[in-house]
Amino acid sequence: MSHTIEITEPVERSAQRERQGFHELDRKAVALTMGGVLIAIFMGSLDQTIVATALPTIAKSLHAFGSYSAVVTAYLIASTVALPIGGKLSDVYGRKRFLIGGMAWFVVASALCGLAQTMTQLIFFRALKGLGTGVMQAAANTTIADLYPPIRRGRSIGMVAMISIVANIVGPLLGGYLTDGPGWRYIFLINVPVGLVGCIVVARFFPPIRRPAVKNFKIDYLGSLSMVGGVVPILWALQKVGDGDRWLSCGIAIPIGLGILFIATFIAVERRVEHPIVPMHMFRNSIISISLLNSGLSMAALFGVTIFVPLFLQAVLHASARESGQILLPFSITIALIATATGHLVGCLGRYRTLALGGAAIAVGGAYLLAHMSPDTSRMALLSNTVITGFGLAMIMPIYNLTVQNAAHLTVLGVATSMVYFVRYVSSSIGVAVYGTILTTHTKSAGLASALNSVYWVIAGLLVTVFVATMFLREIPLRRSNVEDQAALE
């Protein structure tokens, strides 16, 4: 007997689905494809953290201490740029070929990184790897939307959040183990067999999913180039600010000014071309706009907590690096579990706004408590404050993936999904740069503990903004099939 995912709907609706090219998907194919998707997401998330602990050893091995931070920067910039382009092209040419292509590119680039003989080669190969990661992540996260209708998608998005958190926890540990054991090259080479398995699974079991046809499509080369010209200098400058450079120095102000000019050009181009990389009309949908705003602010807040809680522990409470890791572990586990549970709950309720408001309120409360810490704060109090903040963030972040996909027209589903991650990457870079500036400025005048409190107040302010914006978030029922209801989406 064939096992299929059944969607209860009227006969005329079923007929409409057939006319539009949508059909029931085989359960086994969906489950195995989802396994391949999770492999892709795990590899992409792991690669962001596994390198960190190996960087000093890599720099020593390749005799290039002065430029080793570029190994991270090149990867981040390339993956950010590739996200919207990969999302758009997957909307037009299909998710399967871009998921497999992105994974294959990632695997080849990983092998090249593992074989690099100079730091220049490694930086170049890391940039290539970032391009593959961006395409892979855009296609993988949108494939979930193709496999599951919004009413069933919450559980899968929760699983993705859990996989990402697990990768972030495992990454530094695995990176240290491989670096101290077989050698730093294996932090890249380990991706090769895992990625090949993912490619084979997706190639073999990806179900036949038709998509709305895009007639006479032409690649928006001018839009793509102007977007790259805008994103690259801005992200590069933000990374330099995070390393301690001044905002008003020529090396920062000029790239940011140039990037803003290119972004303005990009927006003007996208408004005029027939097939834009990022359709500007998409942002007229208030659900998408508010969800993207909140997604970016939430990620900036999460990065702030992840980076500056360990600093408070070690520099103010005089904890060891090991103790800092032990305190952050419950925070990470909380996020993984609550994100998964939230995905299940949204699917059961078919609603999201109340949960998002509740999560934002909890996160604001946790950040408020963090902002009131002092050298007399106990480690247990810091742990509880951090876990409370993580609990709230874990409730809201998966929701905004779902709200964007639920509100997006099927013809721009890949672009809309990729924009969630694009906004998160850019927001986290801006957040780290701003936090670093606050820390540097306030430490000179008031000391480190007070400066960290100022950072936490900024994080609390971001989360208050998320709460207020969520109050204006229009709630529409989660669709029960991947057939568009045009009236609901406009």
Feature-to-residue mapping (PLM):
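12-transmembrane solute porter fold
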Residues: 32-46, 51-53, 66, 72-74, ...
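Structural detector for helix-capping/boundary residues
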Residues: 96, 125-126, 151, 219-222, ...
